[in-house]
Amino acid sequence: MKTMSIDRRELLKAGLAASAAVALPSAARADIHFEPRPGAWRTFEVVTRMEIGKAERKTQAWIPVPAVNEPEWFRSLGSQWTTNGSASLAHDALSGAEMLHVEWPDGERNPVLEVTSRIATRDRATDFAKPGRPAPLAATERESNLRGTELIPVDGIVKETSDKIVAGAKTDVEKARAIYEWVVDNTFRDAKTRGCGNGDIVAMLKSGNLGGKCADLNALYVGLARSAGVPARDVYGVRVAPSKFGYKSLGTGSQIVTKAQHCRSEVYLAGFGWVPVDPADVRKVVLEEPPTNLAMNDPMVLAARRVLFGAWEGNWLAYNFGHDIALPGSNGPKLGFLMYPQAETAGTRLDCLDPENCRYTISAKEISAG
């Protein structure tokens, strides 16, 4: 068998030349300005309307409502609702996730509800050159953000993978960055994945198929970070506005945001506090940013990759940080996360991604800026 020797220096030169050729941008793509910065607050009104088809006997619904309050970047300003059922707010005791629980009696053939929430949001950015003195995590909060969940364990293959990724990293910042780069390099956004994915990171790692959507890829980031001893958490929500930085893939196309759910993630770093991290959106840019299927060295991808470790745009509503959520009044299984409206009729959980039987719309409009 013939062997081939490769001169590493020549290979590097060839690779750089090829990369430069591929990366030559058009004038428009060369002038990318993706720089989220904390500034003016933007206020949005978000309306979720649900109508449950084929209602049989007792029917219930659970609608996530904003429960996140972070003084630097997000404020939940309250929710109101109308319904022909009986409604009350419910909380997940462990995570603080909040939902509107609505019940309809037997015989109500046309269950309907409408929830209106107001939120204020703004951009985030971390200056890694200027560490500060953020409040340390309380022991209970630190423990909860290092603990495994049903879909995000921190042992076994997750721990083994994390150990390999962070080998040689000396600080939490280095570990967090190494995991981010690994997820960006080794995963992909799979257009065939339903919804935002199910977040089963063990199945991903065991199969070797690291494709999925945000609830998969960012959950993988969180699991790997927690396994490395770095507190991390998912933040479940929905995009509510176009990107002001020209990314079609990172914003909405209209006021109808029914399918704009998006899970982001955060990692807690000494000197910086909770830091935004979103490797899944880097892979979304690769797959979906026009003209689609971009190369990793495309300027739009490079800008997203640079920015989304440490910053994100405030065109998005945060519902909660919850995992393993039991829906009050339901005998069905726990949810891995609560990001979509949920419903049951006659004791059967409806498919929240089935528009025929679990009909809902979500709309968003900006009501003030500044």
Describe each region flagged by the PLM.
Residues 168, 172-176, 181-263, 285-288:
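Active-site neighborhood of thiol-dependent amide/isopeptide-bond enzymes
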Residues 12-15, 30-125:
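Intrinsically disordered, low-complexity N-terminal segments that are enriched in acidic
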Residues 1-10, 14-24:
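N-terminal secretory signal peptides
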Residues 77-80, 129-138, 279-282, 336:
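Short intrinsically disordered coil segments
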Residues 90-92, 99, 112-190, 194-208:
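Acidic low-complexity segments
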Residues 65-67, 117-119, 132, 236-238, ...:
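A mature extracytoplasmic/lumenal domain signature
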Residues 67, 121-125, 189, 240, ...:
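Short loop/turn segments at secondary-structure transitions that flank enzyme active sites
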Residues 242, 246-370:
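Active-site rim recognition segments
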